[in-house]
């Protein structure tokens, strides 16, 4: 089964071959109307920061997943905080709201959402409170999306080059955080 956001409706014709034989559901990640452990895996990419209670979203994903949860979101790093201060990144995602301020953003209400950025410690603490009897295996990985920047400006090219070197040595400062919660390797704590 695949759960999707209603915005996918626009893309279904374009991706029809990928979706043949799949069950699609319009769902609210804050209140998933599925049984516990109903899905093998639950995956989300750049979604949780669009809701008002992202911790509840992770709680629900954890509840309905039998084997694991994959979350790809923004990383709360020193570099990202600095980027927000100097306006290289958004603290509130104004770019996600349409020009008429009718859709996009927080809960698709036309209000710019706060870009919630995560840390390893925050995820670990959340899982300890959600499921205190199990010690979860969590794999964290870091990446950046600077490779998507296409520019002929020599200064931008130099900045990107040195950013790649910096991120090689300081991997956890990158802007993307992947979190895989492997429920198959959970150990009993109590």
Q: What residues fall within each predicted segment?
A:
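Conserved class I S-adenosyl-L-methionine
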Residues: 67-100
